Amino acid sequence: DMTPRHLAEAAKRAGRKAGFRVKILDERAIKKLGMGGVLGVAKGSAEKPRFIILEYLKGAKAQKPLVLVGKGVTFDTGGLNLKPEHGIYEMHMDMSGGAAVIHGMAAIARLKLPINLVGLIPAVENMPSGSSYRPGDVLKTMSGKTIEVLNTDAEGRVILSDALYYGTKYKPGLMIDFATLTGAAHVALGNYASALFYNREKLAPKLVEVGRRSGDYVWPLPLWDEYLPEIKGTFGDLANIGKGDRYGGAIHGAKFL
């Protein structure tokens, strides 16, 4: 029975055991920050959102932190764009990105590595109800950018947009997000590799090699500017899915972020 509150409590327990700091923002604090993406996706659920902040700052003061951002959708029905029967039963795992960040933080803290590390997890449920966000809604995110919602089942990128922007306040040397985003990535690469998107050419081969050594494979997909017009919004800055056809869905999600 995993909800945003339970995920936040699990993060606290991990922090106490491993030795990193945990701060939890409730719905009121999330509203104060203007995280319209997180609030929009969470609207349909009786479970209130949480924004989980993990800090392990054991490096030099001058060292820019590594910021890890994990998708924390504790159950994803698809919202009003409801998922089909065959795809919905395992959607308790849509918080895997957030879980990866918590466990990564715990491993690094236990190893007592001399680095500065921050973890950020927007935690929500995406549920259908009379109060759910709807196709056609326009959400204003923390960055000030607006999102035109074309499909409520493309919610991961909506909440991650707020988390990534929040992460910039740490002035990171590097920011990496982890997410079950998207089904199209699964179609492209099957069961044995995750899609890797990057805006640093030199970093990609290193991540591919780390994946090869660990057995947790990643493979690069393009992030070219040619895809940008396909996610331009009509009534908002960006649409949360590509317009026109279903091709390139994984790339649209990454380009959106």
PLM region descriptions:
Residues 1-7:
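Short beta-strand to alpha-helix junction loop
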Residues 8-257:
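A generic structural signal for tightly packed, nonpolar segments enriched in small/aliphatic residues
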